Design a protein with these regions (language model features):
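Hydrophobic anchor at the beta1->P-loop junction of P-loop NTPases
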Residues: 2
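P-loop (Walker A) phosphate-binding loop of NTP-binding proteins
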Residues: 5
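Conserved substrate/cofactor phosphate-moiety recognition/catalytic segment
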Residues: 8-65
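Conserved beta-strand scaffold positions in the cores of enzyme catalytic domains, especially
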Residues: 22-24, 93-95, 144-148
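Conserved nucleotide-binding/hydrolysis micro-motifs of P-loop NTPases
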Residues: 29-32, 74, 99-105, 153-154
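A glycine- and Lys/Arg-enriched "phosphate-lid" helix/loop adjacent to the NTP-binding pocket
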Residues: 39, 87-137, 179
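Glycine-rich phosphate-binding loop used to anchor ATP phosphates in small-molecule kinases
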Residues: 45-98
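NTP-dependent small-molecule kinase module
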Residues: 88, 134-189
Length: 189
């Protein structure tokens, strides 16, 4: 499960995990496919996508697939809800908190808003980002999140090696453009 505000790097990481074989469940992608081009999303669209994603998480995990949930997960209650869903389906859950300072989020959002549009490049007003920043509940220590700050981004992939493999019985590599590390594959152990 990925956790972080708009422009924190969730979709970039999710894309890289998808390249390693994870099934990428993205609120942004499915909203884009439904015709939504701005944030925040209409509540009815959010509800519909969440129902479908919950069904898919249960189905995919039961089938032994690795899943990356690309959501903001802005509150503990929301994180607990999705953690319980995945664990009940048999998943080993890893929570990754992408913790980027507000000034950097603003810089990234301004650049994104000025660029081309796409599922992960929708227009978000800076004022909306400020509202999300004000209400975001960072994971507590007892949630066991792998925390990643802007200053630690070059060390970020190593966090997975410290907690073990993300993917079941296979090598997992993560490259966020600033460095790369991998957890050992069974043949390297």
């Amino acid at each position: 499960m990925l956790c972080g505000l708009t422009c924190s790097g969730k979709s970039t990481l999710a894309r890289q995990l998808a390249e390693q074989g994870f099934v990428w469940l993205s609120m942004d992608q499915d909203a884009w496919d439904a015709g939504c081009r701005e944030q925040p999303l209409p509540p009815a669209v959010q509800r519909q996508i969440k129902v479908e994603h919950k069904r898919r998480v249960r189905e995919l995990v039961a089938a032994g697939r690795n899943v990356v949930l690309d959501y903001a997960l802005v509150s503990r209650a929301r994180r607990d809800e999705y953690r319980a869903l995945a664990e009940d389906a048999g998943a080993r859950v890893v929570l990754v908190h992408l913790n980027v300072p507000a000034v950097e989020l603003h810089r990234r959002l301004a650049a994104r808003n000025a660029g081309p549009r796409g599922p992960h490049q929708v227009v978000v007003a800076l004022e909306q980002l400020d509202k999300w920043i004000a209400t975001f509940e960072a994971p507590a220590d007892d949630e066991g999140a792998v925390r990643v700050t802007a200053a630690e981004l070059t060390q970020y992939p190593h966090a997975f090696a410290e907690i073990g493999e993300i993917g079941a019985d296979r090598e997992t590599q993560v490259n966020i453009g600033l460095g790369q590390a991998s957890s050992p594959s069974p043949s390297q152990s």
